[in-house]
């Protein structure tokens, strides 16, 4: 269990939540393992299949305390709401902000700042750890270009210009992505991004990682009461979870991309773990997909210090914390949305 931003995260998949007076009680194997007063909580997010008592659900709904349920892997299932839906005000604010060019730009700018900063951090980490195995000159040049981009992005107030900076920064970053592939280089190479369908092994891995990360971000947004389909950076499109795509931008380089590089460089995934279809599309075989998912879950359990909260949390909770911070900003509790700056 972790209490962050006055939100209780219940990460034990066999934990059952109940009510005792004015306290939420966490039970495991019919034993009480923790209690928290309801008045100090603004939300409870449970990653357990065991569920919660109707009494606790009613108490949370009555007090406008978020109570959300996700699978142990992070997929959003449901949340409780009372007679008056507290999320209505949050969503109305979200929709107004999405329709306001200046407000949209302000939020989108911080998503992009996080993405470009973390892209540069990934390059800097490779330079630090493997400078004798890479083209040091080109990596340093790319890092310096991204550093310059950060200054320009921070001052930009036009959405189309922001999107242009984001696209240029992504191009710089991916131009040296191949240099970060240290092993199995004959079988695993990048060259350029291909999405639908992925046309080589690295793109197949990136596409799979991005789809999992998008799922996690969508679940976190829904869990805190935001509409995952209405974004600020990505335009509305039927069936597209634009806000989930917004939120995942800052986590792509430091989580998804680094994860793919790790499983390739450590030879967890190998050349013959893929199938090539008649269309030229490249996909992971079923057994390799299982290995990928197992490693993904292990990665989500790794602990880091959150740069804004300065508290240790698991990688798997990062999307939920960022979604909470975004909701707090929209409610007016924070002066601006704090991007996730990877250290």
PLM features: residue spans?
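Active-site helix-to-loop segments that bind/position phosphate- or nucleotide-bearing substrates
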Residues: 1-19, 29, 35, 87-229, ...
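Catalytic micro-motifs at enzyme active sites that drive phosphoryl/nucleotidyl and oxygen chemistry
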Residues: 14, 33-34, 49, 55-57
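Acidic/polar N-terminal loop/beta-strand segments that form early-domain functional surfaces
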Residues: 20, 29, 46-49, 70-72
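Hydrophobic residues embedded in beta-strands of well-ordered beta-sheets
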Residues: 24-25
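Extracellular/luminal Protease-associated
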Residues: 39-52
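Short alpha-helical basic/polar micro-motif
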Residues: 42, 54, 58, 211
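Phosphate- and other anionic-substrate recognition elements at nucleic-acid/protein interfaces
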Residues: 52-54, 58-111, 120
């Amino acid at each position: 269990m972790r209490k962050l931003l006055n939100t209780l995260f219940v990460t034990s998949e066999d934990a059952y939540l109940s009510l005792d007076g004015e306290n939420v009680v966490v039970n495991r194997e019919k034993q009480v393992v923790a209690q928290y007063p309801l008045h100090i909580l603004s939300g409870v997010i449970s990653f357990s299949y065991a569920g919660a008592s109707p009494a606790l659900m009613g108490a949370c709904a009555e007090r406008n305390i978020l109570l959300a349920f996700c699978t142990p892997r992070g997929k959003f299932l449901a949340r409780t709401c009372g007679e008056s839906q507290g999320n209505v005000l949050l969503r109305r604010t979200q929709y107004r902000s999405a329709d306001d060019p200046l407000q949209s730009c302000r939020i989108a700018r911080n998503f992009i700042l996080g993405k470009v900063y973390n892209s540069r951090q990934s390059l800097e980490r490779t330079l630090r750890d493997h400078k004798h195995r890479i083209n040091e000159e080109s990596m340093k040049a790319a890092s310096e270009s991204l550093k310059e981009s950060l200054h320009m992005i921070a001052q930009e107030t036009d959405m189309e210009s922001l999107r242009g900076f984001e696209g240029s920064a992504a191009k710089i970053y991916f131009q040296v992505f191949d240099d970060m592939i240290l092993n199995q280089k004959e079988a695993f190479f990048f060259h350029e991004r291909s999405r639908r369908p992925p046309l080589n092994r690295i793109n197949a891995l990136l596409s799979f990682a991005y789809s999992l990360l998008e799922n996690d971000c969508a679940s976190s947004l829904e869990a805190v009461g935001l509409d995952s389909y209405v974004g600020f950076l990505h335009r509305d499109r039927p069936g597209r979870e634009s806000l989930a795509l917004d939120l995942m931008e800052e986590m792509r380089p430091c989580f998804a991309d680094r994860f793919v590089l790790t499983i390739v460089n450590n030879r967890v995934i190998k050349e013959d773990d893929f199938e090539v279809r008649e269309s030229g599309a490249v996909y992971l075989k079923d057994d390799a997909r299982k290995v990928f998912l197992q490693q993904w879950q292990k990665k989500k359990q790794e602990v880091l210090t959150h740069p804004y909260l300065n508290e240790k949390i698991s990688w798997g909770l990062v999307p939920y914390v960022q979604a909470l911070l975004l909701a707090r900003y929209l409610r007016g509790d924070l002066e601006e949305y704090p991007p996730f700056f990877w250290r």
